[in-house]
Amino acid sequence: VPKGDLSRSDRIRQLGEFQPSHPILTACVIVAAGFVVECLRRPSALTDPGLYAEDGVIFWLQSLSAGLGSVLQPYNGYLHLLPRLIAAVGSWLPLAATPLFFACASAIVAVSACGLILSKRFSPLIPSYFARIVVFGLLLLMPRLTEVHLSLNSVLWWCGVALFLSCLADDPSTN
């Protein structure tokens, strides 16, 4: 049936029934688009990057001084494993490239956390793949403080989103 012959409700129903023929490739394209959207929410983090709060003073400096030993060092009473791992990798880069690396790593963590919703494990909860794409977009676009957006400080927040989504997901079909 040509597209012009379908009613609006039929087109909406078709969107709801959409299932990608290549789910992994489709998810990768959607996550890549999400990365671009994440970066466009605060372009100054990429065009004029800088270290924010603990990013430089705590994570980066301690990574330089203590090396990988800083990864398991608590800060303010709890471990910051992922931010410290990112800082450990960033400590091998020139100082001028470190803030940009931190911003890109933070964006990758954000879209990866939200990208979990695209998994087949969410089919029982949200059967429509199109609806899962919408939820992915809504998670990425949720309002938050711009000053910590695309910084290592926001990484733990995105880990919380990933943990919450993992709790909602269906059990994996393979081990």
Ranges and model annotations:
Residues V1-V37:
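Start-transfer (signal-anchor) and selected internal transmembrane alpha helices
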Residues V36-D55:
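Helix-to-loop transition at the C-terminal end of transmembrane segments
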Residues V57-S63, L72-A103:
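Short hydrophobic/aromatic helix or loop-helix immediately within or flanking a transmembrane segment
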Residues F130-T146:
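Membrane-embedded helix bundles of polyisoprenyl
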Residues L156-N175:
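Specific aromatic-rich, kink-prone transmembrane helix
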